[in-house]
From Swiss-Prot:
Binding site for GTP: D59, V60, R61, S62
Protein name per Swiss-Prot or TrEMBL: Nucleotide-binding protein Ajs_0902
Source organism, top-level taxon: Bacteria
Keyword Repressor: no
Statement: the UniProt record of this protein carries the keyword Cell cycle: no
HAMAP family, sorted: RapZ_like
Residues annotated for ATP binding in this entry: G10, M11, S12, G13, S14, G15, K16, S17
Alphabetically ordered keywords of this record: ATP-binding, GTP-binding, Nucleotide-binding
Recorded family membership: Belongs to the RapZ-like family.
Record's function text: Displays ATPase and GTPase activities.
NCBIfam families assigned to the protein according to its UniProt record, in alphabetical order: PRK05416.1
GO MF entries: ATP binding; GTP binding
Amino acid sequence: MDLEVVVITGMSGSGKSVALHALEDAGYYCVDNLPPELLTSFVELEHAHHGHRVAVAMDVRSATALPLVPQQLAGLREQGVQVRQLFLDATDDVLVRRFSETRRRHPLSQAEMREGPRPLLHTMRLERELLAPLREQAHVIDTSTLRSAQLLSYVKDLLSVPPSRLTLVFQSFAFKRGISMDADYVFDVRMLPNPHYEPLLRALTGKDAPVIDYLRQQPEVALMLAHIGDFLDHWLDALAHNHRSYVTVAIGCTGGQHRSVYLVEQLAARFEGRWNTLRRHRELDGI
């Protein structure tokens, strides 16, 4: 079947509606809050009437039927459908702040309890438990520090690459701001020589020629780059054979400005001919 289906799930307040808007802008026929039990019949019907790209969003309000989703997606794959799964997430403190700012109730907050409505943090923990099986199967996008426009751009970038090949997402980040929740592999490069302590390089980034020249001259940097590249060379085929659509490789240094940026750029250049590759610089891009 000549059809691509994108299924968006995730935590309430994580930005699922924004992601769905990105898909709508990209030409997908989109439906929000689709009951999971209708997924297969909906996809088949929309394929007959609206073309070859369909996107649906589901949330925890359909919790009792969510266990049906993995089986339905497996059935679609057996029919030759290209299925992509995205799971949007954010840290609890960010989700609490978003609910406070919008003054919206959590979908599970009014579930019947003897003591009354559930406290928000308790509700969020329950939601995480209910959605855990879907999270394990999906590409996770951490929206904790993403503005709406950045999330729109990132989703469009993810879906602009062919679905038939593994997509490698290389991401630089600063440990002082925390490790991203969507990383599959995290490499700590804080032990490498730091251009921050070179006065002429401090204001530059790992994309700038003087910083690139400086780091290329450091034997430890070359060794780290080779070790990470060799590790990925060894295991990416196995991940692709295991039907992984996306793999996020996060490289972290102290400030997310020099060393991690340089390594992300070099690794992306190494693998872009073999796999779909995307670059993200969390601190530089304001992500």
